[in-house]
């Protein structure tokens, strides 16, 4: 298996698909990387030469991926929470951040339903 940015990418798949196994690289970014490294997008990882793999690694090193990207995202969220912005407060409370309604749904963010016992009628 070839390692790019600390991730073992599958050998049998095309290079464009294999690059998407790296956190922070999607299909469009993978296409840009392959084009920048002058490698055919249809080439399978097992058929790549060491030179081509090296060029791809160099290009990927220019992107923020894996641990660096996760760390930056966490720091951004912590910063929002520290300055007590609206978004930071929503993160702190575990509620949707992007303006979604919460009266009915938002169960993914809020967690399982906490039932309250009804008064006896």
Curated annotation (Swiss-Prot):
Part of the 30S ribosomal subunit. Forms a loose heterodimer with protein S19. Forms two bridges to the 50S subunit in the 70S ribosome. Gene3D superfamilies: 1.10.8.50, 30s ribosomal protein s13, domain 2. Keywords: Ribonucleoprotein, Ribosomal protein, RNA-binding, rRNA-binding, tRNA-binding. InterPro entries: Rbsml_uS13_C, Ribosomal_uS13, Ribosomal_uS13-like_H2TH, Ribosomal_uS13_bac-type, Ribosomal_uS13_CS. The lineage of its organism: Bacteria, Bacillati, Bacillota, Bacilli, Bacillales. PANTHER family: 30S RIBOSOMAL PROTEIN S13/40S RIBOSOMAL PROTEIN S18 (PTHR10871), SMALL RIBOSOMAL SUBUNIT PROTEIN US13M (PTHR10871:SF1). It comes from Staphylococcus epidermidis (strain ATCC 35984 / DSM 28319 / BCRC 17069 / CCUG 31568 / BM 3577 / RP62A). This is Small ribosomal subunit protein uS13. One of its GO terms (biological process) is translation. Residues 91-121 are annotated as: Disordered. GO terms for cellular component: cytosol; small ribosomal subunit. Located at the top of the head of the 30S subunit, it contacts several helices of the 16S rRNA. In the 70S ribosome it contacts the 23S rRNA (bridge B1a) and protein L5 of the 50S subunit (bridge B1b), connecting the 2 subunits; these bridges are implicated in subunit movement. Contacts the tRNAs in the A and P-sites.
């Amino acid at each position: 298996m070839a390692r790019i940015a600390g991730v073992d990418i599958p050998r049998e798949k095309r290079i464009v698909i294999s690059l998407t196994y790296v956190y922070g690289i999607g299909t469009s970014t993978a296409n840009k990387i392959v084009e920048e490294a002058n490698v055919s997008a249809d080439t399978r990882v097992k058929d790549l030469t060491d030179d081509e793999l090296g060029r791809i690694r160099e290009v990927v090193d220019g992107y923020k991926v894996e641990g660096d990207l996760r760390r930056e995202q966490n720091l951004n969220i912590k910063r929002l929470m520290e300055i007590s912005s609206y978004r930071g407060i929503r993160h702190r409370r575990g509620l949707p951040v992007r303006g979604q309604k919460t009266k009915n749904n938002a169960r993914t963010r809020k967690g399982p339903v906490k039932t309250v016992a009804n008064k006896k009628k």
